[in-house]
């Protein structure tokens, strides 16, 4: 048994021990935030409803709250004791709802205001990772006045163009020629004021879920993603039965460990907490892993990856949800950000 497998089993055992000693009533009245106003609303509804049903199945006094249909300030009148955030993208994963919950003094799942705001900004995230010596593809911020030929000279082809603040591959284009760059920029700019282009790393697409905070944070098993036609777009992420997910990955123990170490460092340098998921590309020529993005509010749908990794540790979906919520009991007043 590898060291990573041993650590995984230990984490699963700690989760089970935590839940065995958990007083459900101590959680009080729980609000599950779902839906929202971002381009990922549909996925958030799927995640949130799954979370809500899981909590109800465990006897938690849980209630859904959709800030896309209601004014978020109405949270103040709901008398919730804590919040499970199942929102994705802007106005849910970017520090805004976290700031409101801080003002309301409501403990919540996921990262705090600063880490959330940093992680959703792909450019700010890259700057922090690079300053900490973590590998991530070369990039440029694009504008309508960008010199497309200079961009290609810097980043090479193919390259990736995407909105700086969107997730779920929304507005993402794989550009194979300089002539395709203007249209790719316009597509991304239609969703976001900031657009990023980055070198396309060709190789295995991986993701690594993470849990915990600070020095006690841990990396869960790496998952290898094999989408149809090597296209892991919005549809193939959430609705396709053709996308394959390998856990274990079939890669060497050394590569899995390197990816986990990189993902964990990425999580810690951003100051993330509770849980997250780092997306990584493994260069097929060099075997070097490159960080793409950090998700601070990962999906919890039937196709989602964090539940898949947790299951490898013997932690079922409903238990994972309950454990994540239980972590809000550890948050201290004034120390949540």
UniProtKB/Swiss-Prot annotation:
It catalyses: 2 D-alanine + ATP = D-alanyl-D-alanine + ADP + phosphate + H(+). It holds the Pfam family Dala_Dala_lig_N. Its EC number is 6.3.2.4. It is found in: Cytoplasm. Mg(2+) 1 binds at residues 279, 293. One of its GO terms (biological process) is regulation of cell shape. Keywords: ATP-binding, Cell shape, Cell wall biogenesis/degradation, Cytoplasm, Ligase, Magnesium, Manganese, Metal-binding, Nucleotide-binding, Peptidoglycan synthesis. One of its GO terms (molecular function) is ATP binding. Mg(2+) 2 binds at residues 293, 295. Its cofactor is Mg(2+); Mn(2+). Residues 126-326 form the ATP-grasp domain. Pathway: Cell wall biogenesis; peptidoglycan biosynthesis. ATP binds at residues 152-207. Binds 2 magnesium or manganese ions per subunit. Belongs to the D-alanine--D-alanine ligase family. Cell wall formation. This is D-alanine--D-alanine ligase.
């Amino acid at each position: 048994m590898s060291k990573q497998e041993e650590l995984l089993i230990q984490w699963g055992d700690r989760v089970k021990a935590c839940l065995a000693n958990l007083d459900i009533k101590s959680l009080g009245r729980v609000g599950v935030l779902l839906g929202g106003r971002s381009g990922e609303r549909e996925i958030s509804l799927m995640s949130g409803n799954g979370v809500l049903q899981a909590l109800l199945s465990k006897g938690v006094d849980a209630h859904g709250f959709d800030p896309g249909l209601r004014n978020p300030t109405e949270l103040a009148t709901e008398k919730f004791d804590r919040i499970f955030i199942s929102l994705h993208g802007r106005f849910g994963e970017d520090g805004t709802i976290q700031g409101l919950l801080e003002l309301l003094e409501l403990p919540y799942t996921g990262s705090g205001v600063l880490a959330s705001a940093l992680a959703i900004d792909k450019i700010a995230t890259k700057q922090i990772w690079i300053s900490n010596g973590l590998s991530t593809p070369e990039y440029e911020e694009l504008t309508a006045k960008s010199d497309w030929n200079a961009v290609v000279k810097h980043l090479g082809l193919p390259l990736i163009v995407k909105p700086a603040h969107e997730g779920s591959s929304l507005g993402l284009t794989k550009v194979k020629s300089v002539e395709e760059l203007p249209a790719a920029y316009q597509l991304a700019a239609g969703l976001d004021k900031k657009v990023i282009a980055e070198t396309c790393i060709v190789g295995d697409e991986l993701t690594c879920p993470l849990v915990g905070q600070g020095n006690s944070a841990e990396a869960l098993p790496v998952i290898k993603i094999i989408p149809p036609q090597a296209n892991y777009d919005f549809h193939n992420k959430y609705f396709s039965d053709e996308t394959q997910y390998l856990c274990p990955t079939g890669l060497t123990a050394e590569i899995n460990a390197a990816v986990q170490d990189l993902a964990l460092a990425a999580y810690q340098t951003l100051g993330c907490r509770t849980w997250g998921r780092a997306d990584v590309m493994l260069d097929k020529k060099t075997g070097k892993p490159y960080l793409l993005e950090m998700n601070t509010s990962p999906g919890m749908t039937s196709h989602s990856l964090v539940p898949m990794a947790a299951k490898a540790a013997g932690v079922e979906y409903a238990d994972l949800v309950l454990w994540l919520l239980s972590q809000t009991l550890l948050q201290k007043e004034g120390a949540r950000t």
